[in-house]
Amino acid sequence: MKQVNGEKLLASLGDGVKDIRGRITPDAPMDRVTWFRAGGLAELMFQPHDIDDLVAFLKILPEEVPLTVIGVGSNILVRDGGIPGVVLRLSAKGFGFVELAGENRILAGSICPDKHVAAMAMDNGIGGFHFFYGIPGSIGGAARMNAGANGVETRERLIEVNAVDRKGNKHVLSNAEMGYSYRHSTASSELIFTSVLFEGYPEERAQIRAEMDAVRNHRETVQPVREKTGGSTFKNPAGHSAWKLIDEAGCRGLVIGGAQMSSLHCNFMINMGQATGYDLEYLGEQVRREVFEKEGIKLEWEIKRLGVFMPGREVRPFHGVTSE
């Protein structure tokens, strides 16, 4: 049963949409755009042509209409009831660029894949970005959550973030204003990141290539990179590795419906073929329960769960612990 009505929402926006150049899609299937390949419909999906188009759309969008921003579809799990309101999916054409921006500096659009920034840095002898080669997803998401790999975090290279607020006003946030900590920033969720400025340091291209090769080889060896997965499921608790806790709790390879904790890397959930959003989220909460009961540690989700449940298919967070 469909839980959203995109045509009705589109009609409510009035004649202002006639001037919008980007793509507006009512009742857009989210299982086509997320890496899990699961979940319900976006009531209305908007893909702006460029930043001016984004600002124009925001100015006609009523404040009471929910707005959800996604990147390339990694690191998110969409519930089967879909996402009410507008899902903003920035276009590669307008927000997927990566370019040099001064000595050892790189400017990347928020939808630019992390690995493209790593490649740009290598091609120009700029060190400090090899870790991006092993992170699935896009730069906007990396900046939002302080993504990291191989002992390096996004905040170590980030200079500033360009953003737009819900009313279409533009902002620039410094590294300090992002309020970074492990896999987290305090930047307002109302801000839509449009581009990010980074700075590295001079390094020989051969050395950078060797570092990137090591990252790629490690990732392909220990992670299910060819499966339908959103990336790391849970954050590492202080002093612990999430995968090790999951393994010790006996959850490696655990299956619920069409979802499984990967046997290769058990902090990765995978869609084995026909998993629903319910299967995936229920599996995650079951793992949290098992780890707490056996290890006494509460895992915190790294995957973002979006949207609403189908009636009768709700997933209750373990022990009343917040699922955020």
UniProtKB/Swiss-Prot annotation:
Compartment annotation: Cytoplasm
Main localization (coarse): cytoplasm
Catalytic residue positions: 183, 232 (proton donor), 302
Short name of one Pfam family: MurB_C
Record pathway: Cell wall biogenesis; peptidoglycan biosynthesis
InterPro entries given in the database record: FAD-bd_PCMH, FAD-bd_PCMH-like_sf, FAD-bd_PCMH_sub1, FAD-bd_PCMH_sub2, MurB, MurB_C, MurB_C_sf, Oxid_FAD_bind_N
Superkingdom classification of source: Bacteria
GO molecular function, one term: FAD binding
Catalytic activities: UDP-N-acetyl-alpha-D-muramate + NADP(+) = UDP-N-acetyl-3-O-(1-carboxyvinyl)-alpha-D-glucosamine + NADPH + H(+)
Gene3D superfamilies assigned to the protein according to its UniProt record, in alphabetical order: 3.30.465.10, UDP-N-acetylenolpyruvoylglucosamine reductase, C-terminal domain, Uridine Diphospho-n-acetylenolpyruvylglucosamine Reductase, domain 2
Enzyme type, top EC level: oxidoreductase
PANTHER family registered for this protein in UniProt: UDP-N-ACETYLENOLPYRUVOYLGLUCOSAMINE REDUCTASE
Entries under NCBIfam families matching the protein: murB, PRK13905.1
Keyword vocabulary terms for this entry: Cell cycle, Cell division, Cell shape, Cell wall biogenesis/degradation, Cytoplasm, FAD, Flavoprotein, NADP, Oxidoreductase, Peptidoglycan synthesis
GO cellular component entries: cytosol
EC number(s) recorded for this UniProt protein: 1.3.1.98
Domain FAD-binding PCMH-type: 36-203
Cofactor(s) annotated in UniProt: FAD
KW RNA-binding (keyword) present: no
Transmembrane segments: none
Alphabetical GO biological process terms: cell division; cell wall organization; peptidoglycan biosynthetic process; regulation of cell shape
HAMAP family found in the cross-reference section: MurB
Function recorded in the entry: Cell wall formation.
Family according to the record: Belongs to the MurB family.
Protein name: UDP-N-acetylenolpyruvoylglucosamine reductase
